[in-house]
């Protein structure tokens, strides 16, 4: 799925959070959004998945203006892994993942055999097949995050939006989650806190600071020592490994 944003602006009162964000994301491209806290990463993603209405500008999915789509049509096109997922009811893990099938059903429709097969396959993908009967609220933060990813995978959409998806995960599961997402036959837009993960998995990186796009390009183009200092205010050494990947080492000053 292609995504285009045209001069997106978000303001709360007199404070502007995003300034004229215009970009084009190509079908099946993995785009990482980086920047310090308060740079506008989550705000931009919330505009994509319709939690926030931009103060100005337009968003297009495959040429159709996002505001013209029903929420059901949006859910058939895009799944979301948000930063915080609060559940006030005692749902099982399998019930949580089955919620990803909701866009395909009527309000009173029951889950079908295919829905259960898709949900269980998603749990297998994230390594939680043995957890399906567990209460979601009893899981650790990292386990809950993997369940939320499984729910998004069960949605079977053309686009996946993730807001710092590796929060609460140890290194093994960070790599496993990002590898799963990278292998999807889908467009991926993800806010990423860890620049080394962004360097490994992203086709393109968009860097934000104070609500503005600072630069956009391949990891090699964006993740330079100069850009990291400008955006984050820290000194870093950027190494190119023999396989062409980047390794970022931060310096104490």
Q: What residues fall within each predicted segment?
A:
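Conserved structural motif at the start of ABC-family nucleotide-binding domains
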Residues: 3-5, 17-20
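Conserved ABC ATPase signature
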Residues: 110, 135-139, 143
């Amino acid at each position: 799925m292609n995504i285009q944003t045209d001069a997106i602006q978000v303001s709360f009162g007199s404070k502007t959070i995003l300034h004229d964000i215009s970009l084009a994301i190509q079908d099946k491209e993995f785009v990482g959004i980086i920047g310090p806290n308060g740079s506008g990463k989550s705000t931009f993603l919330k505009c994509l998945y319709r939690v926030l209405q931009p103060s100005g500008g337009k968003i297009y999915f495959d040429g159709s203006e996002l505001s013209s789509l029903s929420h059901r049509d949006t859910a058939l096109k895009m799944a979301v892994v948000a930063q915080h997922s609060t559940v006030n009811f005692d749902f099982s893990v399998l019930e949580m993942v089955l919620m990803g099938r909701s866009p395909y059903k009527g309000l009173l429709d029951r889950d079908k055999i295919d829905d259960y097969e898709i949900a269980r396959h998603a749990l297998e993908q994230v390594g939680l097949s043995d957890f399906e009967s567990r209460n979601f609220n009893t899981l650790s933060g990292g386990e809950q995050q993997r369940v939320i990813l499984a729910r998004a995978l069960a949605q079977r959409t053309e686009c996946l939006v993730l807001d710092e998806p590796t929060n609460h995960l140890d290194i093994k599961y960070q790599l496993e989650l990002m590898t799963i997402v990278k292998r999807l036959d889908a467009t991926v837009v993800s806010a990423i806190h860890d620049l080394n993960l962004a360097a490994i998995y992203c086709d393109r990186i968009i860097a934000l600071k104070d609500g503005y796009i600072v630069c956009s390009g391949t990891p090699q183009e964006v993740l330079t020592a100069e850009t990291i200092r400008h955006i984050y205010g820290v000194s870093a050494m950027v190494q190119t490994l023999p396989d062409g990947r980047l390794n970022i080492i931060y310096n104490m000053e």
